[in-house]
Amino acid sequence: MMRFSALRRLRGESHGSTIVEFGLLAPVILALMFGLFHVGVQMQRHNALRSIASEASRFITVEYQKANRLNTTQMANATIAIAVGGAYMLSQDDVAVDVQLAEDQRVTGAEEYTLTMTYDAPNWLTFIGVRDTTLSYSRPIFVPDS
């Protein structure tokens, strides 16, 4: 009987209910905030890959116009140097660049290369089961044919 009277008394008590409700909702709210931040960072990193590829394409094209013919390894190294440089500051361990001569040459008087970049993006959401993300971007590079 004593037990039921204590439960009846607690049922009408509202002090501390806010902290209990916050304790129940806080993990969800924090996960949503971290998720929103994570999506924003992933979008920024994807746009960085696009900008790096464009900047590398311009650099390689200008080098060819100066009669400095770069091989695919030099093109990849130049792209990595741009990626880890001041504007983008991507981790060199997480960036991979592959430059290959395209199988089908679409433009007469030019050589077409395919620049493919992959980036292992950092993941801050492993605590809620989000898997690691690898971002990838590919674009053609056209240089004057010699």
Language-model regions: role of each:
Residues 2, 54-146:
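Short, conserved structural patches
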Residues 2-80:
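Alpha-helical assembly-interface signal, strongest on the long, hydrophobic N-terminal helix that forms
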